Amino acid sequence: MPLRIRLYTEPAQLANVNAAEQAEMSFKAELPSRQAQLSALQSTEEFDVLIVGGGATGSGCALDAVTRNLKTALVERDDFSSGTSSRSTKLIHGGVRYLQKAIMKLDYEQYMMVKEALHERSNLLDIAPHLSAPLPIMLPVYKWWQLPYYWAGIKMYDLVAGGQCLKSSYVLSKTKALELFPMLKKDKLVGAIVYYDGQHNDARMNLSIALTVARYGAAIANYTEVVHLLKKTDPQTGKEKVCGAHCRDVITGQEFDVRAKCVINATGPFTDSLRKMDEPNIPNICQPSAGVHIVIPGYYSPDNMGLLDPATSDGRVIFFLPWEKMTIAGTTDTPTDVTAHPIPMEEDINFILSEVRHYLSPDVEVRRGDVLAAWSGIRPLVTDPNSKDTQSICRNHIVNVSDSGLVTIAGGKWTTYRSMAEETLNEAISVHGLRAGHSKTIGLLLEGGKDWTPTMYIRLVQDYGLEVEVAQHLASTYGGRAFEVAKMAHVTGKRWPIVGKRLVSEFPYIESEVLYAIKEYACTATDVIARRTRLGFLNVQAADEALPRIVELMGKELGWSEQKKKEELATAKQFLYCEMGYKSRSEQLTSMSEITLTNPEVERYKKRFHKFDKESKGFITTVDVQRVLKNIGIQIDENSLHEILNEVDLNKNGQVELNEFLQLMNAVNKGQVSDNRLAILMKTAEESLDQREPVSVDRSGGGV
């Protein structure tokens, strides 16, 4: 089949939305409920545009369409940002390495791609200031000749950005570099170069785009899948044309038609699946690639300084970045199959750890057990069907219009989602003869962007009695909407904080966020831990601890039965286990079949174990642990204790045998496992009990 393809590399015309234009666009003070959105999808006779896909690109297309006064609909078969858009490196960047290739190969297309991305970077930082910020990134230099080489490249990056350069790059001496990044490897270090890019909370950014779309009057619904495309015969040409989609509400199973003059395919890695609904025999254009990231404790990087390894052992680029008080490291680039549930592979996790160790000081031991979460995102790389080499990967994105009028936007990257959306709508308007004005999304504030200031968290503390850390978190997550979340917070019953019960003690997420998440179209517990909060991406164990309370809160609000609650809990745990690296973390215990502890270590750990196993049964249960903890004044509910023991209970018989405990301590000693709750609890209990033991006359030296 012949394809109409347009490759885009030119940056969009930058022109901010003026006040008069914004006044013309209707804006809803209250978000319609999901049920109201589904009703709108079913009752509207015909939309101008139906977008399939609720990631960054699809949501961006919907925002561009609705702000041009087009009657707009969007459906997403999972949750908004459930795919690639929530699994990025969290950078808003132009692409330093693309610029390097452009200069080295005199490639104008690469140069224009970087220029476009730098324009879009500036806009994205402006329209969602609460979710994004400039981040300095250090490029350490270990050979003298590399210093002028890298400096020239980074300066060119600044020059291409022009007036939208975030901050000017600069060179650091070895001493200053180590002062700013103390964990850096000192040996042979000659200095460093620091440049600036943007960083954001990707899933929340995606959600903010989608919520802004809803505010402007579009009908959008998550958990609504396309079963098949609708077609009708064009009376003028006699050809079949796409005129909508037959959809199914994944939650209720209800099916209905959504009719539209134009259908846009913005399904990322699933691009070809929807294209084949239109033309079954069409060749694939998507070549999926998996990118794995890991999260390790925040103390491995400075609070406000990232690190770039420009040349890994296999020629890739690795970023090492502070994010949400943790440290992200990644990414990999491996061909993969398209799946809705990508799993981070152990070899990719170990590759990233190996590269990180290469750049950090030898006395900073990065252990496998330090990995708190890991994920894999599928990049939807695309081929250009018009190219002579049909296997060559297109370095940017493509817009494709099929013979039946299905518009497909594929490829690209997070930073350029807005310009991609603008170009897609321009093509859709042209092909389908839609009546619409120019794009209005440059400078258009996203959900929460209005009324946000860097100091608004102080008002949250003063007006509501929230902890400072919680107030800062709410401000940086919800922006101007943070006050709505604070109003929903329950009284703690403590002197301070007055309101805001945390879901888990070490993270600033509070219970009212779960209730607010439902207003933001969260339908499952996974939506809350993965995309409304980011707990699942930061620490899988903490997310696992928070799940029972999250399910309880959602169940009460949504009227879930006990059976539904159990199913939700199980599904969310499965998500953590498979997609967020909990499986790999757990396997560090089971893989350590050979115990290599020394005899003194074995005796020490046996002694610790028997402080809980008073009857010398050879195993301990929640009752044993609860009894000891109560004795030293620590109270943990039985459900939480069951979860703690279950992490170590390898044969899943409801108890922890001595051998299982020794395997745990063996893994802890080798750095295979860290932050294990049972290990920490038992050590704390042992120390507390030892302090209480009476000192014998012999040990006191005799006398009275």
Regions found by a protein language model. Give the residues of each.
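N-terminal Rossmann-like FAD-binding beta1-loop-alpha1 element of flavoenzymes
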Residues: 47-74
